Amino acid sequence: MPKPNHPSGKGPAKPKAAAAEPVIPENYVDFAEQLMKENCSLITKTKIQNLLRLACDVYNNENRRTEERLLKESVNQIKLLRIRLAYECGRDSQVRQFVESANLFEYLAKLSSVGTCTRQDLIDYYHYMEALVAFHRYYSESKTGEENAS
C-alpha cells in the first residue's frame, strides 16, 4: 500500500530545507555601490534619505548600549519601519523594485525577530543604509553631470 504525503507514495515527504537567514554581506559597501550603479533611478534622494532617517533613531539608541541583544522597544521600532517600507513600496512600484533588489524587507524581518538578532546586526543594517544613500548621491550626481554636459 502506498504511503501518504510523498509524491511517489513511498513514505512521508522530506521537509524542505529552511531558507538561509538574510545577512548583510561583509562586502556591503561594494554591494551597495553595484546596486546604486544599476538602480539609482528607481528611488529618489528624499525617499532613500527618509528610509535612513527612520532607522537612525533605533541605531542611535542601540549604538550607545553594550548589551548584545536589541531592546524590545528597538524591535518594535524596526517593525514600524517595516510597515513604513511596505507603504512606500505599495505607493511606488519603482521603490518596490529597489527595496527588493536591496533585500531591505528580508533584513528588517530578521532584525524584528525578537531574540534572534544582535545589536551588531542592526549596526550593520544602518551602515548598509548609509552606503546606499552615499552611492545614490554619487551616482545620481554623476548622471546629472553627464546629462548637463551633453
Where in the sequence are the language-model features?
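Small/polar/charged residue-enriched interaction surfaces, especially the RNA/DNA-contacting tracks
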Residues: M1-S150
